[in-house]
Amino acid sequence: MALWGGRFSKDPDQLVLEYDACIGMGERMAQQDILGSLAHARMLGEQGIIPKEDAEAIVRGLEGILSDVRAGKITWSVDAEDIHMNVETLLTERIGEAGKRLHTGRSRNDQVALDNHMIAMDQCKQTVSLLKGLISLLLETAREHLNTAMPGYTHLQHAQPVTLAHHLMAYVEMFLRDARRFNFTCEMADEMPLGSGALAATTYPLNRERVAELLGFSAITENSLDGVSSRDYFLDYIYAASCCMMHLSRFCEELVLWNSSEFRFVEMDDAFATGSSIMPQKKNPDIAELMRGKTGRVYGDLVALLTVMKGLPLAYNKDMQEDKERFWDAADTLNRSLEVFSAMFASMTFRTDVMRRSALDGFANATDCADYLVRRGVAFRDAHRIVGELVAYCLDAGKTLEELTPEEYRRFDPAFGEDVYGAISLETCVGARSIPGGPAPQAVAAAIASAEKKLAAL
């Protein structure tokens, strides 16, 4: 008979037990569940709600179970329905009747809410730790490439020259925002819901603040209905995970392109590439491609949980049992992706010579040529048209802007002088963009210093 079976005349059908069981997901929160129960039991004893000796026996029993869980000695039973019932059943088997007092003043609804808050906070901290490692790696690489010129792109067309450091720092900013999102999620989850009961709190004189103190929470939830029915913290985490996976996916997309014969900007390490079963020459960036694909999986987790929650009346509904599968899938996918991406990036080789040659092609200095005319008194719209005509001329003549003669330049506008070549050199084009946020080496160096401070503050 189930622990809640007093009102029922028969046990649940075996099909129902199997369909309803969530032990597979629940066992991942076993430690949090036991830690929550330890705090609850201590508070019950301190408040005199249960005999002190029973509270002490419960604490000893739970500590023993926790030790066995950490040692991998516990096998959970599907017949006990979920992790909460498993722990309570095992506790009662070990310490006797006192174990039946653990659930005093508590419902599984607020018990699982507490577990959820704890695992959300734990996972946020783990993810932020992984992000900090990746950000540190990107910053280290950026420092090495302050002067490595490469083309910047819009519409995947050569636009203006930048540096590899500047490009990498764009992703540093993305991942810093991701880390702040996870810290915010942790802050939002930092409310202790135990004491909410099934939905309407409890008549027992629980000291909720004491439980929060024992578990390291900063505050308690203020409404019992919301305390048991909210899954915002899981949604916040999966949303943050979706954003982070999107950033990883964009980076992976660029690495797939850069690894291609058409770009040749990077060389993937053999350990992070695969071959073809028929084409012996192939070296495929499969890991980066797979990470792109897994991004959609995390998006799916977000939509799935939003859909679970969208029509639920207050307070608890069984639909919410689906929350942990979506949460864990998103967390596992993201954390493993961060680990793999960091290792893949650390092993890559950048072909800086190819990047520089590419930056010299494609008229990436055309804007600087127009700016040159503006500095000599030509209106920008006129300068834009003149340089556009110059580019069309170069394409017909098979030349670059650097290869035009002074006479050819003056054919389009007399404002062109001999100093135009210095104005459109790669180093000048990059170095002139020295305002904060620009690609000039000194600007990127300042951005790196700023990012290091942000990283230290996470």
Describe the function of each predicted region:
Residues E53-I58, G133-L137, F182, W258-E262, ...:
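Short alpha-helical "patches" and their helix-cap loops
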Residues A41, L62, L138, A241, ...:
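Short alpha-helical scaffolding segments that buttress acidic/His motifs in well-ordered protein cores
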Residues H117-V128, R143, P151, Q157-G311, ...:
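Charged, flexible cofactor/metal-binding loops and thiol motifs
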Residues H40-I50, T163-H166, L235-C243, D368-G377:
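Short, well-ordered beta-strand elements within core beta-sheets of diverse protein domains
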